[in-house]
Curated annotation (Swiss-Prot):
Induction: By gibberellic acid (GA3) and submergence. The lineage of its organism: Eukaryota, Viridiplantae, Streptophyta, Embryophyta, Tracheophyta. Residues 144-174 have a biased composition (Low complexity). Keywords: Activator, Nucleus, Transcription, Transcription regulation. It comes from Oryza sativa subsp. indica (Rice). PANTHER family: GROWTH-REGULATING FACTOR 5, GROWTH-REGULATING FACTOR 6. This is Growth-regulating factor 1. Residues 120-129 have a biased composition (Basic residues). The keyword Repressor does not apply. Residues 90-134 form the WRC domain. GO terms for biological process: developmental process; DNA-templated transcription; regulation of DNA-templated transcription; response to deep water; response to gibberellin. It comes from the Eukaryota.
């Protein structure tokens, strides 16, 4: 299938081949088409079109030489078939076209329907990142201690210890018999459960919530009573002006427990009434403060004259002390008072009977002190001043 655009001259065979330049270019064109056919790839139309034109030209020259164009041996097939500015066709269509940009080319066969071999097909894509495996995050199973604590709380049994996974120190919730005073003061499920059962009510009468045992093991209420479950009870110890609400003090029926527990060195909390308490014990026996006929726990300003009140205020301003938590704190009181307003509003006594035993079981932090503490909450009906009175008690 070799077509000659010109006739070979016998004297022109002085070149390297016995073909002219146009004949040699046509042979290369046909050989390239044969390579496409052998590799099974489709032949580009740019290679087939020059063959058709050359065939028509040769047939026209054979029939009518007048229609022949003048020969252009300098341009050849490059200008006639492929034209200028076109990209040169692949000389080896079945070979991988991967090169290094200069002279080297891959020697492997191209993958079917691709320009590159199997090795160089995906070389241009970014393969540095591995595919991310989307794993569903499952929550970790609850610990055995938390599960047991939840089951005990649902069954109505108080858990002894609840250990958390956080590095914070774990707190231990006290047993029901240890938590009875705190539950009565700060509220909670044990207070309601104790009121329903008769056995617990008997023990509740024995360990009254208003006789607060100060012990080194539980110097403060446990942190669990300040949790979100008992948020409505967290302010039971604060000053609430709600009529009839006594967080720290008992009603009139608890006076017997107060007198029974006075001999055991317990700290007692009672409802502060308006009745004066008659006693011949002076307010400050060691320093000689106060009047001997006055109440040791309250100062009735309506029964004293102006001279005694002025002298008492000066002495208390200079020498009144409060022994609280092992520290000697001096309480400074303002020099001026409204005597008329104070005379109309008698003070409410703060302290109950002091324990007079040396070896008392209610000693706090191993000390032999017999200090008592009592607090009052003002009612909504009356507007009474709250005054803290403290003294040293030297048992002889």
């Amino acid at each position: 299938m070799m077509m000659m655009s010109g006739r070979p001259s016998g004297g022109a065979g002085g070149g390297r081949y016995p073909f002219t330049a146009s004949q040699w270019q046509e042979l290369e064109h046909q050989a390239l088409i044969y390579k496409y056919m052998a590799s099974g790839t489709p032949i580009p139309s740019d290679l087939i079109l020059p063959l058709r034109r050359s065939f028509l030209l040769d047939s026209a020259l054979a029939t009518s030489p007048s229609l022949a164009f003048p020969p252009q041996p300098s341009l050849g097939w490059g200008c006639f078939g492929m034209g200028f500015g076109r990209k040169a066709e692949d000389p080896e269509p079945g070979r991988c076209r991967r090169t290094d940009g200069k002279k080297w080319r891959c020697s492997k066969e191209a993958y079917p329907d691709s320009k590159y071999c199997e090795k160089h097909m995906h070389r241009g894509k970014n393969r540095s990142r591995k595919p991310v495996e989307m794993s569903l995050a499952t929550p970790p199973p609850p610990s055995s201690s938390a599960t047991s604590a939840a089951s005990n709380s649902s069954a109505g049994v108080a858990p002894t210890t609840t250990t958390t996974s956080s590095p914070a120190p774990s707190y231990s919730r006290p047993a029901p018999h240890d938590a009875a005073p705190y539950q009565a003061l700060y509220g909670g499920p044990y207070a309601a459960a104790t009121a329903r059962t008769p056995a617990a009510a008997a023990y509740h009468a024995q360990v009254s919530p208003f006789h607060l045992h100060i012990d080194t093991t539980h110097p403060h209420p446990p942190p669990s009573y300040y949790s979100m479950d008992h948020k409505e009870y967290a302010y039971g110890h604060a000053t609430k002006e709600v009529h009839g609400e006594h967080a720290f003090f008992s009603d009139g029926t608890e006076r017997e427990h107060h007198h029974a527990a006075a001999g055991h060195g317990q700290w007692q909390f009672k409802q502060l009434g308006m009745e004066p308490k008659q006693s011949t014990t002076p307010l400050f026996p060691g320093a000689g403060y106060g009047h001997t006929a006055a109440s040791p726990y309250a100062i009735d300003l309506s029964k004293e004259d102006d001279d005694e009140k002025e002298r008492r205020q000066q002495q208390q301003q200079q020498q009144q002390h409060c022994f609280l938590l092992g520290a000697d704190l001096r309480l400074e009181k303002p020099a001026g008072h409204d005597h008329a307003a104070a005379a109309q509003k008698p003070l409410r006594h703060f302290f109950d009977e002091w324990p007079h035993e040396k070896n008392s079981k209610g000693s706090w932090m191993g000390l032999e002190g017999e200090t008592q503490l009592s607090m009052s909450i003002p009612m909504a009906a009356n507007d009474l001043p709250i005054t803290t009175t403290s003294r040293y008690h030297n048992d002889e």
